[in-house]
C-alpha cells in the first residue's frame, strides 16, 4: 500500500513538473509563422511552438458586430474604459477611467496629442451581451480545458499601446476595421527593457516606447531585436506568453482580443497571481480626470 502511494505521489509530481515546465518554456526565434485556413488541431500544434502566428480569419459575425458604427449605434450610451498611454502612472492613480462609448471614441479621435486608447472592456462586453458573440465565434482558437476567458475590444487612432507582455496560455488579436502594426520582441530581451511588474493592474510593461525610443533608453533598446507585422481587417495574430508587443493604430481601428488560461497555466503563474491578490487587498486609488 505504501509503495502504491509513493508511486502515485511520484506520478502526480512528475505530471505537474512536466506541464509546468511546458508553460514556463519560451521560444526566442525572431520569426513569425503564417498559416492558410488552419484547422483547430493544426493551430494548436503551431501555437505550442511558442512563436507568433498570423493568418486570415474571415469571421463575418465578428466583423459585423465588433466595429465602431455598429457599437455606436447599438451601445453608444454604455460605459467603456479609457487609458492615457503616454504618461507614467502615479501612485494610487487609476489606470482606467469610465466614459460612455460615444465620449470615449470622441476623445481618442479629437484629442490633438493622440494619447488615449480604449481597452480593458470586459465589463462593457458583459453588459451589452457581446460576450455571446465572442463565445459563439471563438471555437477555432479557444484551447481545450480552459479555466479563464478574457474578451476585450480595443479602440485606437494614430497612437500605440504600451510595450508589454501577457502570461496567458493563448493571446489572440483580430483586427475588425482599420489598420494596425504590431512590434514584437522575444522574451530574452526582457533584461534590457526596464520591466515594470504592476501587480495592481496585473500588467507587465516597459517604460520604453519601441516606436519612438527616447535617447536615455536607446543603449538598452538597441540590444534587443524586434519583428514588425501589419494587420488588415480579417487578420488575426497569436502572440505567445512572455513575448513583448505594442500595437500601433495607423488609423481609426478596432481590435477584438481573445485571451485564455488553462488550469495548468494558472498553476504555472500562481506566484504572480498571488502577488496580484495581495497587492490589491489594501489599495486606495485616486481618481484623476485625464480628458479635457
Regions found by a protein language model. Name each.
Residues 1-236, 244-292:
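N-terminal accessory scaffold of Fe(II)-dependent oxygenases
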Amino acid at each position: 500500500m505504501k509503495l502504491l502511494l509513493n508511486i502515485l505521489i511520484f506520478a502526480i509530481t512528475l505530471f505537474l513538473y512536466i506541464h509546468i515546465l511546458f508553460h514556463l518554456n519560451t521560444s526566442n526565434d525572431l520569426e513569425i509563422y503564417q498559416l492558410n485556413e488552419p484547422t483547430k488541431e493544426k493551430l494548436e500544434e503551431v501555437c505550442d511552438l511558442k512563436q507568433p502566428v498570423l493568418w486570415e480569419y474571415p469571421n463575418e459575425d465578428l466583423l459585423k458586430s465588433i466595429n465602431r458604427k455598429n457599437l455606436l449605434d447599438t451601445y453608444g450610451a454604455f460605459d467603456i474604459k479609457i487609458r492615457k498611454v503616454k504618461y507614467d502612472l502615479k501612485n494610487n492613480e487609476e489606470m482606467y477611467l469610465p466614459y460612455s462609448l460615444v465620449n470615449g471614441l470622441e476623445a481618442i479621435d479629437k484629442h490633438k496629442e493622440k494619447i488615449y486608447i480604449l481597452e480593458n472592456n470586459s465589463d462593457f462586453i458583459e453588459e451589452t451581451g457581446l460576450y455571446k458573440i465572442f463565445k459563439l465565434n471563438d471555437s477555432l482558437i479557444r484551447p481545450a480545458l480552459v479555466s479563464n476567458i478574457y474578451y476585450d475590444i480595443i479602440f485606437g487612432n494614430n497612437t500605440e499601446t504600451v510595450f508589454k507582455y501577457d502570461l496567458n496560455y493563448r493571446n489572440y488579436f483580430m483586427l475588425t476595421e482599420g489598420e494596425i502594426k504590431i512590434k514584437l520582441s522575444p522574451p530574452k530581451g526582457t533584461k534590457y527593457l526596464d520591466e515594470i511588474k504592476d501587480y495592481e493592474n496585473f500588467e507587465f510593461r516597459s517604460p520604453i516606447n519601441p516606436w519612438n525610443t527616447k535617447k536615455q533608453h536607446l543603449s538598452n533598446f538597441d540590444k534587443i531585436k524586434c519583428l514588425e507585422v501589419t494587420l488588415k481587417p480579417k487578420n488575426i495574430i497569436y502572440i505567445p506568453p512572455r513575448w513583448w508587443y505594442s500595437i500601433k493604430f495607423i488609423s481609426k481601428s478596432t481590435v477584438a482580443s481573445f485571451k485564455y488560461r488553462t488550469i495548468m497555466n494558472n498553476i504555472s503563474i500562481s506566484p504572480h497571481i498571488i502577488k496580484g491578490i495581495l497587492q490589491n487587498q489594501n489599495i486606495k486609488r485616486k481618481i484623476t480626470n485625464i480628458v479635457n
